[in-house]
Amino acid sequence: MVNCTSDYCVKDISLAPEGMKKIDWVSRFMPVLQHIRREFEEKKPFKGVRIAATLHLEMKTAFLLLTLKAGGAKVSAAASNPLSTQDDVVAALAKEGVKVYAIRGESKEEYYEFMNKALDIRPNIIIDDGADMVSLVHTERKELLDEIWGASEETTTGVIRLRAMERDKVLRFPVIAVNDSYMKYLFDNRYGTGQSTWDGIMRATNLLVAGKNVVVVGYGWCGRGIAMRARGLGATVIVVEVDPIKALEARMDGFLVMSMKEAAKIGDIFVTATGNIKCIRREHFELMKDGAIMANAGHFDVEIWKPDLEELAVEISNPRPNVTEYKLKDGRRLYLLADGRLVNLVAADGHPAEIMDMSFALQAKAAEYIKENHERLEPRVYVLPREIDEMVARIKLQSMGINIEELTEEQKKYLESWQHGT
């Protein structure tokens, strides 16, 4: 069953009550976004503003979209990943008046069809996750460019794409790299990805992590979190990295560091978090142990190269939900989780609510910042002002009952002076 109207396209609109329960549940653990929602409800900063979003459509993102709607915005949304949509949550959004077009398991053609439908509101602001919507506007929906004030981007992968657009001088409007805010990458990328990736792997496999060799490919903030939590679960952690500085940092953090070919021979579980293509490919599959498990924590399903796996396999099956078994000619079996897509969102519920509270507070404030400042911003990639980062941190600390120290006037003067020495 699929329910489609001009205002939404969802799997089953009757699932809305269950979706609303999920949204209500996570909202209780998102005090910063609650604070911003109350502010938006009072001030209506988005009255008359149209906002289109491409996000993982699950309960936390739903609360963000409803917060923007509470601020007076007309909101539309489509999925940023074909397999991360939660159909009951999407139904709830439709019932709440968000123009939403997403079905879990949608085809690639439907993915872009739904994104185009979300763009049909002719947005002033875009909220993106992976830069697909911004890219689509610049390639196939150029008629919308003059009405777009700016966009915000949630992910490392998306920011990389957008900086490439800026470098090539094709970016037509300002973009806020929310991913590059301290309150995003220090918490979401590290603690959020670290916990939710292992949540997805363990739900998909029901296997023990302790005692296994875990290979983490990429040691950015996401890789750091994945490695940290793997160690906490009792694994021996091996990091694969191309950046010599990050590789050295991983070694100083206590992890083994190897090339991919070396790690492929001994790994039990492989997790990619690079934002790049073909990080695990044929030459590595050929070296892996029987029973090796692979999962991806990067945005797109290109880090573990499935075409090579399919060519090597003599038989492909699904022994469990979200687990694909590739049987090779020599009898070895390799397992790919979540079809190589984001394991934390496909096989689990994504990041914890308390983490996304901070990230989505930044997204809400980024939309407000674009609305208030777009006339003076140039078509390039920006980072949110530090005061917004600090505001989110202070509200979060208050919600946790934590008081921090304040500088005295004497200390402030000392820090601003150059005259005090030895």
Swiss-Prot record:
<dbReference type="InterPro" id="IPR015878">
    <property type="entry name" value="Ado_hCys_hydrolase_NAD-bd"/>
</dbReference>
<feature type="binding site">
    <location>
        <position position="129"/>
    </location>
    <ligand>
        <name>substrate</name>
    </ligand>
</feature>
<feature type="binding site">
    <location>
        <position position="184"/>
    </location>
    <ligand>
        <name>substrate</name>
    </ligand>
</feature>
<comment type="similarity">
    <text>Belongs to the adenosylhomocysteinase family.</text>
</comment>
<feature type="binding site">
    <location>
        <begin position="155"/>
        <end position="157"/>
    </location>
    <ligand>
        <name>NAD(+)</name>
    </ligand>
</feature>
<keyword id="KW-0554">One-carbon metabolism</keyword>
<feature type="binding site">
    <location>
        <position position="188"/>
    </location>
    <ligand>
        <name>substrate</name>
    </ligand>
</feature>
<dbReference type="Pfam" id="PF05221">
    <property type="entry name" value="AdoHcyase"/>
</dbReference>
<feature type="binding site">
    <location>
        <begin position="218"/>
        <end position="223"/>
    </location>
    <ligand>
        <name>NAD(+)</name>
    </ligand>
</feature>
<feature type="binding site">
    <location>
        <position position="276"/>
    </location>
    <ligand>
        <name>NAD(+)</name>
    </ligand>
</feature>
<dbReference type="InterPro" id="IPR036291">
    <property type="entry name" value="NAD(P)-bd_dom_sf"/>
</dbReference>
<comment type="pathway">
    <text>Amino-acid biosynthesis; L-homocysteine biosynthesis; L-homocysteine from S-adenosyl-L-homocysteine: step 1/1.</text>
</comment>
<feature type="binding site">
    <location>
        <position position="189"/>
    </location>
    <ligand>
        <name>NAD(+)</name>
    </ligand>
</feature>
<dbReference type="GO" id="GO:0005829">
    <property type="term" value="C:cytosol"/>
</dbReference>
<dbReference type="InterPro" id="IPR042172">
    <property type="entry name" value="Adenosylhomocyst_ase-like_sf"/>
</dbReference>
<feature type="binding site">
    <location>
        <position position="344"/>
    </location>
    <ligand>
        <name>NAD(+)</name>
    </ligand>
</feature>
<dbReference type="GO" id="GO:0004013">
    <property type="term" value="F:adenosylhomocysteinase activity"/>
</dbReference>
<feature type="binding site">
    <location>
        <position position="241"/>
    </location>
    <ligand>
        <name>NAD(+)</name>
    </ligand>
</feature>
<keyword id="KW-0378">Hydrolase</keyword>
<protein>
    <recommendedName>
        <fullName>Adenosylhomocysteinase</fullName>
        <ecNumber>3.13.2.1</ecNumber>
    </recommendedName>
</protein>
<feature type="binding site">
    <location>
        <begin position="297"/>
        <end position="299"/>
    </location>
    <ligand>
        <name>NAD(+)</name>
    </ligand>
</feature>
<dbReference type="GO" id="GO:0033353">
    <property type="term" value="P:S-adenosylmethionine cycle"/>
</dbReference>
<dbReference type="GO" id="GO:0006730">
    <property type="term" value="P:one-carbon metabolic process"/>
</dbReference>
<dbReference type="GO" id="GO:0071269">
    <property type="term" value="P:L-homocysteine biosynthetic process"/>
</dbReference>
<dbReference type="InterPro" id="IPR020082">
    <property type="entry name" value="S-Ado-L-homoCys_hydrolase_CS"/>
</dbReference>
<dbReference type="InterPro" id="IPR000043">
    <property type="entry name" value="Adenosylhomocysteinase-like"/>
</dbReference>
<feature type="binding site">
    <location>
        <position position="154"/>
    </location>
    <ligand>
        <name>substrate</name>
    </ligand>
</feature>
<comment type="function">
    <text>May play a key role in the regulation of the intracellular concentration of adenosylhomocysteine.</text>
</comment>
<keyword id="KW-0520">NAD</keyword>
<dbReference type="Pfam" id="PF00670">
    <property type="entry name" value="AdoHcyase_NAD"/>
</dbReference>
<keyword id="KW-0963">Cytoplasm</keyword>
